[in-house]
């Protein structure tokens, strides 16, 4: 077994296009990092193409986490998940979260997981990475 044994893998995280909120995303990034992941934070207002590029440009990506606080950016989250699924890139799971996001919405847009807060996001990320 080779590679970086100190890491559970890489987590790409960002707030979806059109959304400039970062406090929730930052908390999730900190929790996921402290759980043992390398975190690549793409920032806010991230277009779907940038999420895909980040998966292509980073090694051992296990999680892509999409955050959104505004109901108006939920379509962007849906498009991001769709683009990631259609990209044919493999080996990672997609997590979504943010105030307007529900388990039902996450399921509807084919995300692999929904978490309501930063603590549960870290737990779920570990579960998904080891699945």
Stretch-by-stretch model annotation:
Residues 28-35, 40-111, 124:
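Cofactor-cradling patches in redox/metallo enzymes
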Residues 112-118:
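Short acidic-hydrophobic, aromatic-tinged amphipathic segments that line or gate anion-handling sites
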Residues 124-131:
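A charged, well-structured terminal subsegment
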Residues 1-25:
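Long amphipathic N-terminal alpha/beta scaffold segment
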């Amino acid at each position: 077994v080779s590679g970086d044994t100190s890491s559970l893998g890489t987590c790409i995280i960002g707030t979806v296009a059109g959304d400039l909120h970062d406090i929730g995303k930052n908390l999730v990034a900190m929790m996921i990092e402290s759980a043992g992941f390398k975190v690549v934070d793409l920032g806010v207002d991230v277009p779907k193409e940038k999420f895909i590029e980040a998966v292509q440009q980073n090694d051992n990506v296990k999680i892509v986490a999409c955050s959104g606080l505004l109901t108006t950016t939920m379509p962007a989250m849906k498009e991001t998940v769709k683009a990631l699924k259609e990209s044919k890139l493999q080996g990672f799971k997609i997590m979504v979260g943010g105030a307007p996001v529900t388990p039902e919405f996450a399921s509807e847009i084919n995300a692999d997981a929904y978490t309501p807060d930063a603590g549960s996001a870290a737990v779920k990320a570990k579960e998904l990475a080891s699945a």
